Structures are given as C-alpha cells and as structure tokens.
Regions:
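Long, contiguous binding/interaction regions
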Residues: 1-45, 49-158
Length: 158
C-alpha cells in the first residue's frame, strides 16, 4: 500500500536529516521526497511517498508525530490527492525524429525547453503515472540525461 505523508516542519538545518533517518532506521523506503519552504518562511513542507503494510504506515505516522521539529503530519492515499512531478529529459535525436518528438510533446503537453542539432531537453509537469508513461515514450530517442522531482501533493478539496 502506498501512502503520501505531507509533513509540516520547522524550517531549520538538520530537520530533513532527522526525518529521513527515522525512515532509514526502521527500514522503510522513501520512494519520493520533496521539501520546500511554505508561504511562512519559518515552516517547510515535506512530501514523502512510502509503501508498506497499513501497520507500518501507521507506525511511520506515529513516529513522525513524535519528532520535536514536526508541526503537523497529514497522510492520504494517492486517490485522495492532487499530485504532480516535474521531469527534464535530454534526448539525442536526428532530424527524421523531430516531428515525432514534437507530436509526443503535443500529446503529453510536454515542452521543448532547449534544443541543438543533436539534443533536445523536454519538460513535463504531470501526475507520477503520466511521467512514467512519458519516459517510456521517449526512451527510443536515446535518453542522455534525466532529472525528476519527487511528488508534490495536496489533499483534494472537499
């Protein structure tokens, strides 16, 4: 079972290390992690995606709530959230492939953000599943470099 943890923490040095070590010490894998300052510069929000049994995920939530620097922990399932990832992919291409790459970008709403005669950098912001599918679509063009953010997520509006 996959769970998204949205953790508000004090925005200070060492907090990320403390939270990630909680997962490591207990043998839980962090599948995705993003951290950023909120509208309040004294608070950061960590979005952590992890999988495990319902008991394990409940234990993670309890342990997070015990941390001094943790202000609030919210958990939700993927279907209860709006989530996005950003990916930058540098691909090699030849002139004959250019129209196919442009078509893929139009279909997926990806952008071509940089180009030379032999390389292109593509940008996509979408759901994690669609980002995975996009990667599968562009693999055939010889991926030179790929950089992907972790999941950003918020609970859906009620």
């Amino acid at each position: 079972m996959k769970r998204i943890f949205s953790v508000s923490v004090e925005n200070r040095s060492g907090v990320l290390s403390k939270v990630s070590s909680l997962f490591a010490r207990r043998g839980y894998n962090i599948e995705s992690l993003t951290v950023g300052e909120t509208h309040d510069p004294t608070i950061s929000n960590m979005t952590i995606v992890s999988s495990g049994s319902p008991r394990d995920l409940e234990q993670i939530e309890k342990q997070l709530n015990k941390k001094l620097d943790v202000i609030k922990v919210r958990t939700f399932k993927e279907e209860e959230s709006v989530s996005r990832e950003v990916i930058l992919v540098k691909i090699k291409y030849v002139a004959q492939n250019r129209s196919e790459i442009i078509e893929i970008c139009q279909i997926t709403k990806a952008e071509i953000v940089d180009t030379t005669d032999t390389n292109m950098i593509l940008l996509l912001c979408d759901t994690p599943d669609r980002v995975d599918k996009f990667i599968d679509m562009v693999k055939k063009f010889n991926i030179v470099e790929l950089d992907r953010t972790g999941t950003l997520a918020m609970k859906k509006c009620k």
